[in-house]
Design a protein with these regions (language model features):
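Intrinsically disordered, low-complexity regulatory segments that flank or precede the catalytic domain
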Residues: 1-78
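Protein kinase glycine-rich loop
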Residues: 88-95, 99
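Conserved N-lobe beta3->alphaC-helix segment of eukaryotic protein kinase catalytic domains
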Residues: 110, 115-138
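A short, aromatic-enriched beta-strand patch in the conserved N-lobe beta-sheet
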Residues: 148-149
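Conserved short submotifs of the Hanks-type protein kinase catalytic core
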Residues: 154-167
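Activation segment signature within eukaryotic-like protein kinase domains
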Residues: 186-187
Length: 424
């Protein structure tokens, strides 16, 4: 088995170079297919092997049934080709690419198709496709399903499970703030997804943020866009400038674009290597943003917090060392920070905190454990999964599906319970 730069195992024979055809799909050519067996839809693993793997995972019967249905559908689809897709609309853009809602005409399935324009050499492009094949083995109720990837006319296409509720950054725009009971369920699921990637595949996400957490009308919460392809990350870092992101890839500061700064952790700016602790920082910052309804660096001042939360706010005063720039004409609201001003703030100023008196002490404690400046002091995945806030969330019956459908104005795919707003 060969390995890529993230130490991920690749299928046997995947290092073989393919011809420079414009519609390379990243799956086996007919000649190679005959020698390796019918594994085109699943990389190096058969359907039977994948079904056996999901039997070993911790999930309920409903989740297991949905996983089995997804894998069977995926086998029927087979190889993907650009001509088989019909664009239905655009879902979002960022990180150098656009995500469309598309119908796979032969099967009738609706998919999310991410298109990334890359001007790279054929060998680099083929390496990206090979590295993305690892996603065939990433099957979990907490990870967005992967149908396949291919290349055509300067674009890498990554075809994924369609989540009709969209990403949490879009939900946040509609909801203004996300209620704590919903956030607790989100956090619990994200932790399970990160633990699955780490324990089963030795993968670190590298880009935890609201736009990479997706929801649907069935109440499912799944993470996407994790750093499985080192070559793709490097190629995008070298190519794109100026789109907002929360990614913390292992690239030098001089190569970071504007998009890569917002959720970067302090130790990365000091030259340390990326680790699971980096994902924990990004998760903590995401929780604060979704809870208060605004990016928390620089932190909002007391007047802004009182406008947001009213009389719930207890005594809040700015940190004596805090430098929180304000916009002229918009009292209390942080002005956008220049990139190096933001980086300096992340490294040298206190980390964000949830405002006192608004949220439960357990939620505040979990966020504080995520946002320790020193990664050695930051809580790890196991500690967070055993945290009181998470354990309580797993016991509570919160209607995620109802909240998603109400927030995004979509039709429930299953009957919903009383709105989660009642718990907020």
């Amino acid at each position: 088995m060969s390995k890529n730069k993230f130490n991920l195992k690749l299928p046997p024979g995947s290092i073989e170079q393919t011809n420079d055809h414009d519609n390379h799909t990243g799956t086996e050519t007919p000649q190679r297919k005959a020698s390796t067996g019918a594994t085109g839809s699943f990389g190096a693993m058969s359907l039977e092997s994948l079904l056996k793997c999901i039997q070993e995972l911790d999930m309920d019967d409903t989740q297991r049934k949905r996983m089995e249905i997804f894998l069977v559908q995926k086998q029927k689809i087979g190889e993907l080709n650009a001509d088989d897709f019909e664009k239905l609309g655009e879902l979002g853009a960022g990180n150098g690419g656009v995500v469309n809602k598309e119908r796979h005409k032969p099967s009738g399935l609706i998919m999310a198709r991410k298109l990334i324009h890359l001007e790279v050499k054929p060998a680099v492009r083929n390496q990206i496709i090979r590295e993305l094949k690892v996603l065939h083995e990433c099957n979990s109720p907490f990870i967005v399903g992967f149908y396949g990837a291919f290349y055509r006319q300067g674009e890498i296409s990554i075809c994924m499970e369609y989540m009709d509720g969209g990403s949490l950054d879009l939900c946040l725009k509609k909801a203004i703030r996300i209620p704590e009971p919903i956030l607790a369920k989100i956090c619990s699921t994200v932790l399970k997804g990160l633990a699955y990637l780490r324990e089963k595949h030795q993968i670190i996400h590298r880009d935890v943020k609201p736009s990479n957490i997706l929801v649907n009308s069935r109440g499912e919460i799944k993470i996407c866009d994790f750093g499985v392809s080192g070559q793709l990350i490097d190629s995008m870092a070298n190519t794109f400038v100026g789109t907002r992101s929360y990614m913390s890839g292992e690239v030098p500061v001089e190569r970071l674009t504007t998009s890569l700064y917002y959720y970067i952790e302090p130790e990365r700016l000091n030259g340390d290597h990326y680790s699971v602790a980096s994902d924990i920082w990004s998760l903590g910052l995401s929780l604060v943003e979704m809870a208060i309804g605004m990016y928390p660096i620089p932190p909002p001042d007391p007047n802004t917090l009182k406008k947001i939360f009213g009389s719930k706010i207890e005594g809040v005063s700015p940190s004596p060392t805090s430098r929180s720039p304000r916009s002229a004409g918009l009292p209390g609201e942080p002005r956008p920070m220049a990139i190096f001003e933001l980086l300096d703030y992340i490294v040298n100023e206190p980390p964000p905190r949830l405002p006192p008196g608004v949220f439960t002490p357990e939620f505040v404690d979990l966020v504080d454990r995520c946002l320790k400046k020193s990664p050695s002091e930051r809580a790890d995945l196991t500690t967070l999964q055993n945290h009181e806030w998470i354990k309580r969330a797993e016991q509570e019956d919160v209607d995620i599906a109802g909240w998603v459908c109400k927030t995004m104005d979509i039709t429930p795919s299953t009957p919903t319970k009383p709105s989660a707003d009642a718990n907020c």
